């Protein structure tokens, strides 16, 4: 309908232009792919993040329903690889989770500890992303993490598992998207503290 005027309200790239963080929406998967550390979530910038995420394993109580045998309860068992949302890339995907855990936290001692550590890692990573997006308010006007739930029991980016259990990420997301956010950012040995508000009236605060 060339005679009808259309004005996009979200950041818009325009027809035929290449992907750019300066206009339009943006998908950020460099961390999940294993090519960047989780702190990269703080360094990227875009007008609108429409996809970004990080994986974790299922809760043990959910996992034992499809991996009841002890031999199945290994990160690289056939069952665990079948229940990895990246499919053909499952070995690498699970390996990346383990590598990021070892890069950021004490080594888990048990299989259960590894599952839990993956939840902490996922929550910490996405918290970095959300807070960075919100600190950049005015340039960045959208932040949609991937993903809310699962359609089957699987290791994935979801914040709620197939059984309906909230992972640590879901609690963090709820807090990180509150209408007021106090967020610290360290760079070049400097600590910057931001007060971000989505309320309609200006607000002041005192940092104690």
What feature does the model see in each segment?
Residues 1-12, 16-17, 143:
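Active-site mouth of glycoside hydrolases
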Residues 20, 30-205:
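Substrate-binding clefts and catalytic carboxylate motifs of secreted carbohydrate-active enzymes
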């Amino acid at each position: 309908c060339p005679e009808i005027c259309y004005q996009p309200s979200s950041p818009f790239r325009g027809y035929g232009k290449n992907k750019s963080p300066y206009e339009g929406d943006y998908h950020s998967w460099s961390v999940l792919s294993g090519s960047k550390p989780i702190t990269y979530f703080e360094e990227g910038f875009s007008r609108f993040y429409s996809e970004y995420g990080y994986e974790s394993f299922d809760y043990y109580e959910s996992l034992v329903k499809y991996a009841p045998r002890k031999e199945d309860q290994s990160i690289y068992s056939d069952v665990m690889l079948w229940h990895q949302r990246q499919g053909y890339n499952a070995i690498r995907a699970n390996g990346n989770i383990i590598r990021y855990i070892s890069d950021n936290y004490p080594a888990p001692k048990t299989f259960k500890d590894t599952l839990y550590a993956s939840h902490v890692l996922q929550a910490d990573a996405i918290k970095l992303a959300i807070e960075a997006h919100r600190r950049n308010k005015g340039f960045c006007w959208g932040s949609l993490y991937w993903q809310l739930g699962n359609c089957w029991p699987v290791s994935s980016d979801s914040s709620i598992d197939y059984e309906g259990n909230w992972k640590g990420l879901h609690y963090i997301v709820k807090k990180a998207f509150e209408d007021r956010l106090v967020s610290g950012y360290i760079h070049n040995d400097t600590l910057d503290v931001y007060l971000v508000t989505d309320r309609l009236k200006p607000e002041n605060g005192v940092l104690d």
